[in-house]
C-alpha cells in the first residue's frame, strides 16, 4: 500500500480551499497515520513550466509546509493532470516495487485527482480515493 499525496503545493493550499482548516487537519492525520503504519507516502507535484511561478525552483511549487515530505520520501513531478503519465516516473516506480494498492488524496478533485485515479485503474492498480482530504481550489 502507498499513500499518494497529489498537488498539495504552497501555491494552492490556502484559504481558497473549501473547509481549509479541516482539509489541512485531515491530510496531516492521513500522512501521520500512514507513516505510523509503515505505509509509504509518495508525493506528486504539478509543474506549470518555467516562468509561471509554479515550477521547479519556485516557492509556490514546494509542498505545503504542513505536509512536507520527509527526506526519505519520494517525490514525482508531473506536467499534466494524471500522475501516471510516463514522464513522471511514478508508474514505473510502483511497477518496480510490485505495488498495486494506492490511496489517493490531494488537490484539484475534478482534474488531477480524477485523472490520476482513472489512469491508475487503466494501468491495473487498485486505487482508494479518500474523498474527505481532497479539494477543488477556486483558482482565479
What are these regions (language model features)?
Residues 1-81, 91, 96, 100:
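Active-site acidic carboxylates
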Residues 45-46, 106-107, 131:
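Short secondary-structure boundary segments
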Residues 79-80, 106-109:
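Active-site nucleophile and cofactor-binding loops and adjacent substrate-binding regions
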Residues 84-88:
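Structural motif
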Residues 100-106:
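Short beta-strand-loop elements within alpha/beta enzyme cores
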Residues 113-123:
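Short Gly/Thr/Asp-enriched flexible loops that form oxyanion-binding sites at enzyme active sites
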Residues 128-139:
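Single conserved hydrophobic/aromatic residue that forms the stacking wall/gate
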